[in-house]
Every structure is written in C-alpha cells, then in structure tokens.
C-alpha cells in the first residue's frame, strides 16, 4: 500500500472538520453582514471539488499499486509506460479539480472577483488550506512513525547486545 489508511483517514477527517468550522465562521460573518453569501456559496462549491481532489490523490495511488502487484514481470515491463501516463493523468486530474471551481465562479461572475452569486477568494483559499492540512498531517504522522522506528531499532540493539539487562540490574 502506497498511502497508509491512517494518512487517508486523518487527511479527510481534518480537512472536513476544518471546512465545517470555516463554513460556520463564514455563516456567522454573513449573518452579521460583514461578508456576503457569495463567500459561503463559493466555499461550498470549492470544498466539494477539493474533497474530490483529495480522494483522487489519496486513494487512486493505492488502486494503481494493487493492480500493478497482480501483474507478472513481463506485464510490468510492458505496462510501465501506461502506469507512468496514468500517474501523470492522476496529477493533472488533481490540478483540474482545483481549477474547476475557479472557472465556474469566473464564468458565473463574468470574470469579476465578486458577483451576485460567487466570490473567487474562497475558491483560491480552500485548496491552499487543503494543501496546508495535507502537508501538516503527513509531516506529523511521518515524524511520529520515524520516532517509533528509531525507538524500535534502539530496543532491538539493546536486546541484541544485552545492554538492557545490565541497566536493569
């Protein structure tokens, strides 16, 4: 498995909790007349497309990996270019899902920042926040995993050398 299930789960949960809290704050600001409903509509649209991008980026590599492990050596050699192209399509698909809300909002607003229905700033800010959540979650999980591996290596070294017995007595 390329992307650990824990990473998938934490990324989706944290981004969606962050999105819900952000939408609640935006609704509060809307009801106090600080911002318009355009921000809320744009945020909802962008959160949907950001979740699609997040799912594609986290789950599709695992699907590719499981399908690649079922191939024998000759098939892998002939399918290597296909998997390379599929990886490029996956990456460009994620970029496409970031751009879709901006294009929709731009088209509806007649290419102005704020229109009657949408505002373009949430379409830019939500994907950036998703990338930030993605980076922070992955850094924290990988850092924790590296520390656990180092502890296990140290314990294995102590057991192998007998140092742990000397320290106990």
From Swiss-Prot:
Keyword Ligase: no
Any one GO cellular component localisation term in the record: proton-transporting ATP synthase complex
One biological process term in Gene Ontology: proton transmembrane transport
Top-rank taxon, per record: Bacteria
Function: A possible function for this protein is to guide the assembly of the membrane sector of the ATPase enzyme complex.
Similarity annotation: Belongs to the bacterial AtpI family.
The protein's name: ATP synthase protein I
Provenance organism: Mycoplasmoides gallisepticum (strain R(low / passage 15 / clone 2)) (Mycoplasma gallisepticum)
């Amino acid at each position: 498995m390329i992307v650990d299930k824990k990473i998938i789960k934490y990324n989706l949960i944290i981004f969606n909790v962050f999105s819900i809290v952000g939408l609640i704050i935006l609704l509060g600001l809307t009801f106090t007349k600080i911002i318009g409903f355009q921000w809320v509509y744009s945020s909802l649209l962008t959160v949907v497309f950001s979740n699609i991008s997040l799912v594609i980026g986290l789950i599709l590599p695992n699907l590719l990996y499981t399908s690649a492990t079922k191939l024998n050596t000759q098939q892998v050699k002939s399918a290597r270019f296909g998997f390379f192209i599929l990886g490029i399509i996956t990456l460009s698909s994620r970029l496409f899902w970031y751009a879709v809300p901006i294009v929709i909002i731009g088209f509806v607003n007649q290419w102005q920042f704020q229109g009657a229905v949408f505002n373009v700033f949430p379409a830019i800010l939500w994907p950036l926040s998703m990338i930030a959540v993605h980076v922070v979650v992955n850094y924290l999980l990988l850092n924790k995993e590296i520390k656990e591996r180092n502890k296990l290596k140290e314990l294995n070294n102590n057991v192998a050398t007998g140092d742990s017995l000397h320290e106990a007595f």
